[in-house]
A protein has these predicted regions:
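Conserved beta-strand scaffold positions in the cores of enzyme catalytic domains, especially
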Residues: 31, 52-54, 156
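A short helix->loop->beta-strand "cap" motif at the edges of active sites that frequently abuts
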Residues: 114-118
Length: 208
């Protein structure tokens, strides 16, 4: 929002500079979003992409994703952008409509700058820590999924099914003690296969 302090300006500058120094072009897959991605240290292995660029930063919110879209995404001209963001918006009291609106602005900005780009949006997870706000999480995901259907090269991937057990309870063994962030098994068993499949789908649609 206008006037909000740029909490992660320094972190974003360091992140983008570090990537520019080592990234080999063209970038096939770029991850961007909040700490769920920032902490995905095994992403290159789990997604079977040794050259993957991971630009997860801070405890970012969707408006910060829009704020830094040039530095973290557009400047690297990726073929596929994989995004996870929204959890921190929910914690901050944002409405589902506001979260979805900013995600759509982000997607449209990327598409306008990079024609033909594929976008994978990973659903906000229904973390145990957010149990009292699952209704907002669900509504935000529904709105974002609908927005993804508006673009031919957008894929919405819902990881929540894999994060719940047969009794429809969160698989707590996949979470750290904070009930929000994940253990390596969650990335390996749930995020990796689901996101890989989504990337393959969006690549196929991008190729036409």
């Amino acid at each position: 929002p206008a006037g909000q302090e740029k909490r992660y300006a320094a972190e974003v500058e360091v992140l983008s500079a570090r990537s520019r120094a080592v990234v080999r072009e063209p970038v096939e897959t770029l991850l961007v979003g909040s700490s769920i991605f920032r902490l995905w240290s095994s992403a290159a292995t789990d997604l079977r992409d040794a050259d993957l660029v991971n630009h997860g930063f801070g405890g970012s919110r969707t408006w910060e994703l829009v704020e830094y879209v040039e530095e973290l995404v557009v400047d690297f001209s990726p073929e596929v952008v994989v995004c996870y963001c929204g959890s921190n918006d929910v914690n901050a009291g944002a409405s589902a409509a506001a979260i979805a609106r900013r995600v759509e602005i982000f997607m449209k900005t990327v598409e306008d700058a990079l024609p033909g780009v594929g976008i994978v949006y990973v659903a906000i997870n229904r973390a145990p820590q957010k149990r009292d706000r699952w209704a907002i999480v669900d509504e935000a995901n529904q709105r974002i999924e609908k927005a993804c259907r508006k673009g031919p090269n957008r894929v919405f991937v819902d990881v929540n099914e894999g994060l719940f057990d047969a009794r429809d309870s969160p698989r707590t063994e996949l979470y750290l003690e904070d009930g929000l962030h994940f253990r390596p098994a969650a990335y390996r068993e749930v995020f990796g296969p689901a996101v890989r499949n989504a990337i393959e789908r969006v690549r196929a649609s991008s190729r036409g």
